[in-house]
Each structure stands twice: as structure tokens, then as C-alpha cells.
């Protein structure tokens, strides 16, 4: 994997590095691009939405690494609402939507499925984060079919695959990835780094990809070109500074 798209800084409230430290780690690993995706404001300790609007001040390159501006938003309710205003979307390149227990207390399979389908169809999110969490069971096939229809990526999260966070996710991640492959879904991969030394740690994801023989043309984090092409498919405007990376 060449792109790291799920990273956090101390601004998330429970992470421990700056964006510059994350970029430096990416640079030392030879990663050409990464996205900063701090938690949105409903998460305890997370920043006000102005933090995300103001990402426009960030340079497009830090330590020689291309910087994508993003956010990991919270799925807030059955209607699929997220916790950043619509006006913020235009300042972001990448929005991941995830269930988090402090924001959306787990309900049941039907409720979780309905919320995911609503958020996919809203058109506001580019990917669904760490879906393997057993606390948020859902109809895998129904949700992934909807994601295929709307070109929303399914995240395969390295931290979930370690088995120590969101315990019980490992087998579910494999099943989700298997169905994603069968249905032709795009997947995104990430280490879910909350500390700079975890940038670029994809070993568990790579094992899953190898085990399932997942097609690389459906892994949007395989290269900058593929990731930027996916953003274009999603309707994002081209990023002029990344023109050379898109070829």
C-alpha cells in the first residue's frame, strides 16, 4: 500500500502526534501521500468544526509528502447524519464515516444497516470506516451493494485486524472484504494511526489482501494515481498541486 488515508493528530483528543510528525514518518517510509483525518466534534475530546474548515491553510506537501485534507466523521443517528456542517465539505478532500460507541450507542443489526445505507446515499462520505466492529453488526451484503452503487469505499483497517482494538473484528473484516470482492466494491486501507510511528503499518491488511487475492484495481490506496482517480469518480475537483501524481 502506498497511501495512508486514516491518520490522527493530538487534535483528536486521544492521539499523540502532530501532522508534521505524521508527515515526517510517512516520508521516512517513502510513502508519497497521506491524509489527515482527525475525529469530528461529537467524539469526546475532538475539535470544533472550524478545525476542519481551516485545513485549507495546510500546505499540499510536508516533508515531501502529499497531504490530503480529511475528517473521520461520526455517524450520529438512524438518518445517517454526520457531525460536520455541509459548508465544511468543500474544504475537505476525503471524508470517512464511522460508528463510535460514545456518539452512537450500539443498537441492532437493522438500525445499523439503515444508518449506513442512509449515509451512503447522502453522497457526503467517501468511505465507511472500521466496519468490522462487532458492536455494530449490519447486513454486509446490503450495505456493500449500496456502497458499490454510490462508489463509496469500504475501509479495511489494520488496527481492527490486530485483534486488540474493536475486539472481535478480525473474522468480520475478512468476511466484509470477501463480499466486497464478490460485489466489485472499492476498498481503502489504513493503519488508523494515532501515533506517528504507526504510519504505514499495513502488515495485517496486506495479509488479508494476499489471502483473498483482492484485485489491486479495486484497492484505491494502492497508488496516488488510483486514489486521485477515485476522488475524481466521487466528484471531487482535481487538486492542481497533485497533477504529477495523477499520471
Swiss-Prot record:
Coiled coil: none annotated. Binds 2 Zn(2+) ions per subunit. It comes from the Bacteria. Its cofactor is Zn(2+). Zn(2+) 2 binds at residues 72, 100, 130. Its EC number is 3.1.3.-. It is an enzyme of class 3 (hydrolase). Zn(2+) 1 binds at residues 14, 39, 194. Keywords: Hydrolase, Metal-binding, Zinc. GO terms for cellular component: cytosol. One of its GO terms (biological process) is bacterial-type flagellum-dependent swarming motility. GO terms for molecular function: phosphatase activity; zinc ion binding. Belongs to the PHP family. This is Probable phosphatase VSAL_II0887.
Amino acid at each position: 500500500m502506498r497511501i495512508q488515508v486514516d491518520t490522527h493528530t493530538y487534535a483528536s483528543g486521544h492521539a499523540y502526534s502532530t501532522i508534521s510528525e505524521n508527515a515526517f514518518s510517512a516520508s521516512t517510509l517513502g510513502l508519497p501521500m497521506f491524509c489527515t483525518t482527525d475525529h469530528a466534534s461529537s467524539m469526546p475530546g475532538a475539535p470544533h468544526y472550524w478545525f476542519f474548515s481551516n485545513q485549507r491553510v495546510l500546505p499540499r506537501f510536508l516533508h515531501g509528502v502529499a497531504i490530503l485534507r480529511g475528517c473521520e466523521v461520526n455517524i450520529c443517528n438512524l438518518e445517517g447524519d454526520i457531525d460536520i456542517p455541509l459548508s465544511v465539505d468543500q474544504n475537505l478532500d476525503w471524508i470517512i464515516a464511522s460508528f463510535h460507541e460514545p456518539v452512537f450507542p450500539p443498537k441492532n443489526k437493522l438500525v445499523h444497516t439503515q444508518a449506513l445505507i442512509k449515509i451512503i446515499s447522502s453522497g457526503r462520505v467517501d468511505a465507511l470506516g472500521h466496519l468490522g466492529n462487532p458492536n455494530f453488526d449490519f447486513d454486509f451484503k446490503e450495505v456493500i451493494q449500496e456502497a458499490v452503487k454510490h462508489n463509496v469505499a469500504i475501509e479495511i483497517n489494520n488496527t481492527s485486524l490486530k485483534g486488540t482494538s474493536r475486539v472481535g473484528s478480525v473474522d468480520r473484516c475478512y468476511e466484509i472484504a470477501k463480499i466486497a470482492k464478490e460485489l466489485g466494491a472499492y476498498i481503502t486501507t489504513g493503519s488508523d494511526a494515532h501515533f506517528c510511528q504507526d504510519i504505514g503499518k499495513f502488515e495485517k491488511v496486506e495479509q488479508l489482501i494476499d489471502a483473498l487475492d483482492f484485485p489491486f484495481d479495486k484497492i484505491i490506496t494502492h497508488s496516488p494515481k488510483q486514489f486521485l482517480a477515485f476522488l475524481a469518480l466521487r466528484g471531487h475537483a482535481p487538486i492542481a498541486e497533485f497533477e504529477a501524481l495523477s499520471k
